[in-house]
Every structure is written in C-alpha cells, then in structure tokens.
Amino acid sequence: MIAIYTIVCLVLALLLIYFWLYQKVSKHIPENYPNAANLQKIDSNKKTLVCFGDSNTHGNVSYNWVNDLRSELDDYWVFNAGVNSDLTYTLLRRISDVIAAKPDLITILIGTNDVNATMNIKMEKRYQQLGRIGKDISPNFEDFKANYQQIIQILKQKTSAKIAVMSLPVMGEDLAHEANLRADKYSEFIKQLASDENLLYLPLREKQKAFLENNPQPLKHTFEETYILLNYSVIWHYIFGKSWDYVTAKHGFQLTPDNLHQNSIAGGMIRDLVKEAILKNK
C-alpha cells in the first residue's frame, strides 16, 4: 500500500512539474511586455525601444539579451515583445501592442519558427496545437515574405519608429543542414526587404555563421534531435538551475543549447548589434 501511495505521489509530482514547465514555456509573457499596465510606466524623458519577436527575444528559454539592454541603455525605455513559439503569423496578431507603445525604435527578430514549421509535419502540427497558426495553415516561404512585408508596412504607417530587422540566427551548428539552408534563404529576403524599405539591417546570421566557421568542432547532436534537446534544456535550466551556457556545453554546441535558442555568446551578439544600431542612428 505504501509503495502504491509513493508511486501515485511521484506521478502527481511529475505531472505538476510538467504542467508548470508547459506554462513557463508556452503561456509565459515577458514581465516588461508592452501591455496596458506596463505602458502606464513609461518614462517620458526616455526614448522607447520595443524588441519584437519570438523566443529568441522573449528570453525565458533562451538568453535574455533584452534584459541586458534594459540595464545598459539608460536613455531608453525597453519593452520585450517577444513570445515563445511565435511566427510571422502571430506577430501580425500582436502588432497593435507594439504600436501602442509609440516606439522610437523597433527591432524585429522573427522567422526561426517559420522555418522550423516547414521541416516536417510534426513540427507544423505542434505550432497548430500551440495555437500559433490555424489548423488550415501550412507555413511556407511565400507566406513568410507576405507576412513580413505586411508587418513592416503596418509599423511604417502607424508608428514613426526606426525599424531594425535581423537575419535569422543559426538553426543548429551544422551549416550545411537543410534547416540552415532554408534559414539562409529567409535571411536573404530580410536583407533585401531592409534595402527596399530603407530599414536598419542587423546581420545576426552572418555574425553567427562566421563564428562557427572560425571555430569548427565536431557535433554530438543533429537538428533532428531538436525537440528532445529543447525539453532537456528546459529541465536543466528550470529544474536544476543550470545556465543556458552550461546546457550548450553539455550538448556539445557553442552558440545554442538546443539548435533553436541562444546562449550568452549568441545572445550577446544580438545585444551588441542592437546597441551598435542605436549608437549609429542617434
């Protein structure tokens, strides 16, 4: 009887942990998201920066470079408008939150999940189950381009902000993998769009690829293992208190703990590119 009771308690504890982690990853919103409550706190003596994107901006399953900017940019009020698992489709749903902040500068880092959703039907279904895309939507390059162009047009029409767009971070550290080849294609579009629309272009992908090319090392895991690596990363970080850098090293990578997200080196590259853009455009 005691053994059964112990097993039941263990199962319940594991379910509670799973539910908590699911909420942490899938439902969490940054504390400095531009919602109504936070908009009331804006310091009118500062400029407003809104960082718009997915988990690589959100920073709760990835290094939080936005928090670095909050502590380093004394003359900016910094909002984090990143949400885990978002695609260009979902940025369009949330774009009114960015507009409401009346930003002076907007950074956009989006596309990793748009690419990831095209890699196999299981990933597409996961984004559907999370409610990021409709059941009838199959993400593709043409939709990505149309969505991104619409995001830029809306922001240009409804804000007076400077807009800085970033090429995609590496998707795993095998640069010859199909995921990275697709991310190259998506990033080439972003670069061209920046030129066509007179936007600031931040070459994140170029910077990360150069780092990996200059520091080659054999890989322990493939891109196909991403989902399980992500689960392990979240457990290591939130259950055992390990840093994203620790998880990165454990998984045999240099820039990412799980093929999709950023450690402090990769996140630092994003932070520094944004800071450079601000300094050049004061």
Spans of features found by a protein language model:
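Feature marks short, highly hydrophobic, charge-poor N-terminal signal-anchor/signal peptide-like helices
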Residues: 1-7
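Generic intrinsically disordered, low-complexity segments enriched for polar/acidic and small residues
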Residues: 2, 15-19, 30, 49, ...
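Core hydrophobic alpha-helical transmembrane segments of single-pass membrane proteins
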Residues: 9-14
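Serine-esterase "nucleophile elbow" of acetyl-processing enzymes
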Residues: 17-105
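Alpha-helical cap/lid subdomain in secreted, periplasmic
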Residues: 43, 71-72, 90-282
